């Protein structure tokens, strides 16, 4: 790749709602735009999902399409296609504490009265648990319906409140993201975790859609190490990037 205009500047992107519509595949136009953006600045992506799910959205070559690819908030880190770091929830918490948390959560979901339930209520990832009251096996239509229902009935915020109080001794962070679930991970394992790999950059611009308190982009958006930008859609992301990096 030819020398970039601003190699010391990093543009770092959330995935869901920022580069793609929620849980949808990236458009060819957006992929082409990101390719053009790499001619101007260094580019990275950071998502809460594991690498398999991020690859489903951004393509199988995601670790080489961007200079940095951080899955599970950076707990699994790639630079130029090479794995540069991993961290494990199991080794950090231990099986006994994990089991206690999972058992309580499944009991809570079992007693939850919501219109529908499907399957995969807890997804165990290397660096976090993803908890979904409706279950991740639901269809896109069911996802959309649950998101509307949750906005009225606060199913996820209420559940997070109960779990936060019950497991205060574990020092966990609860982060509501996407349409149907929330992530659970040790304090400090939010998206700011990936910043440890980015010390060389003088300027880091972060783009995300859930930048409000409690959203899974909040901590990195507010970090002293980043310049935060709230976006509303992939089109808005592209528009802001054009204005910031490509208009000079």
Swiss-Prot record:
The biological pathway it contributes to is: Nucleotide-sugar biosynthesis; GDP-alpha-D-mannose biosynthesis; alpha-D-mannose 1-phosphate from D-fructose 6-phosphate: step 2/2
Specify whether Cytoplasm is a keyword of the entry.
Answer: yes
Binding-site residues for Mg(2+) 2, renumbered to this chain? 221, 226
Q: Which Pfam families match?
A: PMM
Which reaction(s) does the protein catalyse, per the Swiss-Prot or TrEMBL entry? alpha-D-mannose 1-phosphate = D-mannose 6-phosphate
Q: Which residues bind alpha-D-mannose 1-phosphate?
A: 23, 125, 136, 143, 181, 183
Q: Which cofactor does it need?
A: Mg(2+)
Q: Recorded E.C. number(s)?
A: 5.4.2.8
**Sorted alphabetically, which InterPro entries does this protein's record hold?**
HAD-like_sf, HAD-SF_hydro_IIB, HAD_sf, PMM, PMM_cap
One GO biological process this protein is involved in is: GDP-mannose biosynthetic process
Tell me which residues bind Mg(2+) 1. Answer: 14, 16, 209
Active site per the UniProt annotation:
14 (nucleophile), 16 (proton donor/acceptor)
Keywords in UniProt for this one?
Answer: Cytoplasm, Isomerase, Magnesium, Metal-binding
Q: CDD domains under this entry?
A: HAD_PMM
List GO terms (cellular component aspect): cytosol
Q: Which GO terms describe its molecular function?
A: metal ion binding; phosphomannomutase activity
Q: Does the keyword Isomerase apply?
A: yes
Q: Where in the cell is it found?
A: Cytoplasm
Whom does it interact with, and what assembly results? Homodimer.
Q: What function is annotated for this protein?
A: Catalyzes the interconversion of mannose-6-phosphate to mannose-1-phosphate, the precursor for the synthesis of GDP-mannose. GDP-mannose is an essential sugar nucleotide for the synthesis of D-mannose-containing cell wall polysaccharides (galactomannans and glucomannans), glycolipids, glycoproteins and the antioxidant L-ascorbate.
Q: Which family does it belong to?
A: Belongs to the eukaryotic PMM family.
- Protein name (record): Phosphomannomutase
Source organism (scientific name): Oryza sativa subsp. indica (Rice)
């Amino acid at each position: 790749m030819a020398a970039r205009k601003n190699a010391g500047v990093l543009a770092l992107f959330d995935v869901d709602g920022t580069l793609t519509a929620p849980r949808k595949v990236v458009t060819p136009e957006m992929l082409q735009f990101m390719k053009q953006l790499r001619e101007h600045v260094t580019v990275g992506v950071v998502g809460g999902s594991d690498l398999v799910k991020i690859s489903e959205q951004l393509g199988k070559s995601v670790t080489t399409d961007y200079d940095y690819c951080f899955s599970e908030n950076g707990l699994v880190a790639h630079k130029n296609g090479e794995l540069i770091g991993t961290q494990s929830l199991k080794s950090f918490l231990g099986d006994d504490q994990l089991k206690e948390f999972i058992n309580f959560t499944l009991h809570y979901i079992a007693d939850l009265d919501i219109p529908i339930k499907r399957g995969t209520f807890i997804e165990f990832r290397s660096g976090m648990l993803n908890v979904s009251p409706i279950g991740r096996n639901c269809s896109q239509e069911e996802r959309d319906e649950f998101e509307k229902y949750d906005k009225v009935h606060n199913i996820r915020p209420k559940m997070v409140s109960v779990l936060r109080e019950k497991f205060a001794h574990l020092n966990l962070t609860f982060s509501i993201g996407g349409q149907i679930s929330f992530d659970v991970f040790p304090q400090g394992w939010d998206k700011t975790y990936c910043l440890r790999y980015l010390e060389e950059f003088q300027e880091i611009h972060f783009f995300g859609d859930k930048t409000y308190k409690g959203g899974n982009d909040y901590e990195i958006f507010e970090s002293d190490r980043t310049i935060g930008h709230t976006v509303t859609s992939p089109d808005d992301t592209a528009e802001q990037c054009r204005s910031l990096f490509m208009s000079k």
